[in-house]
Amino acid sequence: MTELIKKGIAAREASSFLAQATTKQKNTALINLSNDLIANTATLLKENEKDIIRAKEKKTPDTMIDRLRLTEERIKEISEAVKQVVTLKDPIGEVTTMWKNEAELTIGKIRVPLGVIGIIYESRPNVTVDASILCFKTGNAVILRGGSDAIDSNKALMNVIQESLEKSGFPRTSVQLIEDTSRETAREMMRLNRFLDVLIPRGGAKLIQTVLENATVPVIETGTGNCHIYVDKAAEKQMAIDILVNAKCSRPSVCNSAETLLIHESVAEDFLPAMEMALKEYNVELRADKRAREILKDAKAATESDWEEEFLDFILAIKVVDSVEEAINHINKYGTKHSEAIISNDYATGQAFHQKVDAAAVYINASTRFTDGFAMGFGAEIGISTQKLHARGPMGLTELTSTKYIIFGDGQIRN
């Protein structure tokens, strides 16, 4: 019996316990965990430093090292995030609908945990806590597999989580970490159908594609974000510039940042120079098609791969289009079904865009950066789903549940 199968058995047993836990019990445990994270700050920083040293020895880019790094302030933020989950409504046990049928049976539909969730993710140690608390709040056991670059941080965080949950009366195996970061073990996890009810990958395109190609466990794809801003001929110029700068430059390394600008040909000559001036402050590299380069003399020539790329950097691809239909076709060809935006004061054009663009979130006159659980107003999320089953868009607590029918009768039999 492999170590992973042992974890699967333990997780299945823990999930039965978690499914019966009350909201009060879960919230009390989360409050204790929030305090325990602060109490163990010194240990967490010490273990995190091992990952940082190893990353520097490998000459890892500074942006990636920053994602790995824990600080006192970041641990406080993680602790506060745990407290925020306490304030969120527990969806477990919620009756979503109830009715009586012709046989006078009372039929209710209620929310229940998914069971055991597997999560495969990359660098950021905070995901270890985020994923743990969201699954825990919804009564799900979880098995985590983080990246090798954050293994010491993840092990330290997992130790705090497990000890804290145990002190609160919950099984240590409610939350587990796979410490073997080999590809072989990752692939074994992807095929753990006997124990995992769903697998959620969080990371770059390569990780997600590997999971989709190898998993036999049902997968919820938290896809990459090749997001577009389309500036229509009826756009308000300054609004469009402000939205583009926010969508591209506020946090370029996240999946809801804009990667491509599509601009209507009738406003390109006026808009593009003003846009270029606004982006200069951030040293954004522009990669433009032939028509855009006739206006933007310093822009690099865009290649076919640029239309497909999630840059996660200060790089913007630019294409001039003849119509909203051309913009929609480009988005549906190259987009990743994440977040797409149109800037237009024409109601009919906005409606056509949102009806025809295939994406989890479609914006009219707003930045794509709002595709986020907290920004949308429903709290923490486990990722942004770009598929249509079982969830789509930011996955909050509700999306980590399934449903069950409860039927009340008084002796009815079916004729």
Swiss-Prot record:
GO function terms (MF aspect): glutamate-5-semialdehyde dehydrogenase activity; NADP binding
Subcellular location(s) of the protein: Cytoplasm
Membrane spanning residue stretches: none
Enzyme nomenclature, EC number: 1.2.1.41
Catalysis: reaction(s): L-glutamate 5-semialdehyde + phosphate + NADP(+) = L-glutamyl 5-phosphate + NADPH + H(+)
Pathway connected to this protein: Amino-acid biosynthesis; L-proline biosynthesis; L-glutamate 5-semialdehyde from L-glutamate: step 2/2
A single GO BP: L-proline biosynthetic process
Top-rank taxon, per record: Bacteria
Keywords tagged on the record: Amino-acid biosynthesis, Cytoplasm, NADP, Oxidoreductase, Proline biosynthesis
Entry-linked InterPro entries: Ald_DH/histidinol_DH, Ald_DH_C, Ald_DH_N, Aldehyde_DH_dom, G-glutamylP_reductase_CS, Glu-5-SA_DH, GPR_dom
GO cellular component entries: cytoplasm
PANTHER family in the record: DELTA-1-PYRROLINE-5-CARBOXYLATE SYNTHASE, GLUTAMATE SEMIALDEHYDE DEHYDROGENASE
UniProt similarity note: Belongs to the gamma-glutamyl phosphate reductase family.
NCBIfam families: PRK00197.1, proA
The protein's name in its UniProt record: Gamma-glutamyl phosphate reductase
Organism: Listeria welshimeri serovar 6b (strain ATCC 35897 / DSM 20650 / CCUG 15529 / CIP 8149 / NCTC 11857 / SLCC 5334 / V8)
